[in-house]
Amino acid sequence: MTRLEARLAELASAGQTITYGALARDLGWRMADLTAALEMLMERDAAEGHPLRAAVCAGRLGAGLPARGFFDKAAALGFDLSDPEGFVARTRAALSGR
């Protein structure tokens, strides 16, 4: 498990979210590196039939929802985003085991 995966798992199990900036600082990464790693993780999660762990990230704007790029990538991976807030809520619940 990578440091990114471990941090996302810790947040998910606690039912918490984190901003992209805070996560990048926690890991000591540049934002571009974090974004690329999250997109690769989303691809792997989708391929393995797992909830998207990147859903625990929250943009600075948007009421605690992930940034636009999360939704663009999820749509490209074939997820139904007709109810974005519901999709994120269901995904976060699945990740936290609740």
Regions found by a protein language model. Give the residues of each.
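Nucleic acid-binding interface residues in structured DNA/RNA-binding domains
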Residues: 3, 9-12, 17-98
